[in-house]
Amino acid sequence: LRYFIKTSTRANKRSTVRRLNRRFPRIHSGKKVQRQARIGVYIDQSGSVDDGMLAKFYAELNKLANLAEFTVVPFDTQVAEDKIYVWKRGQSRTFERVLTGGTCFRSPTDHCNREGFDGMIVLTDLMAPKPQACKSQRMWMTTEYYAKHPYFKTSELIVAIPD
């Protein structure tokens, strides 16, 4: 997780005369760099994901909240736009189920491409057809059982949580 967040970090650069350019001091202005990762965490709220698995997902997100701030997006066949919230760094939460239904990875991928996240973490049981390509880095998180028996093959990173 830590490596995924560090590699998904976007840098905002601006010119400044107060910070000197190391290569050409006092000739060219320097750059001020601000790095911040915009991570979208997409939680599968379908009926195939039971409450025990959701509790494990939220336990992992509590650990992830020590590293970075991220946006939590619940989905089943559609993204629940009214249930999206930002999980601040250092915050801790308990799990909540807000949707029940089937699973489709097309709508969260479209949402991630539209919102322009630097990284996409999908917490799911991988029981849906293979999604389309994503513009940002995508990582899958599931339990060990579903990691050994995925519904589709992917070259993207799959992280398994112990059962």
What is the role of each PLM region?
Residues 26-30, 59-61, 108-110:
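Generic recognition of flexible, low-complexity loop/linker segments
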Residues 68, 135-137:
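Short glycine-/polar-rich loops that comprise or flank the Walker A/P-loop
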Residues 17-20, 49, 96-101:
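Short, flexible loop segments at the rims of nucleotide/cofactor-binding pockets, characterized by
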Residues 40-41, 121:
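Conserved beta-strand elements of the Class I
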Residues 71, 80-129, 142-148, 153, ...:
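Von Willebrand factor
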Residues 130-134:
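Short, T/G/N/S-enriched strand-turn elements that build extracellular solenoid repeat scaffolds
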Residues 2-40, 52, 66:
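Acidic, polar low-complexity linker/tail segments
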Residues 37, 45-80, 87, 94, ...:
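…and closely analogous acidic/polar surface helices at protein-protein or active-site interfaces
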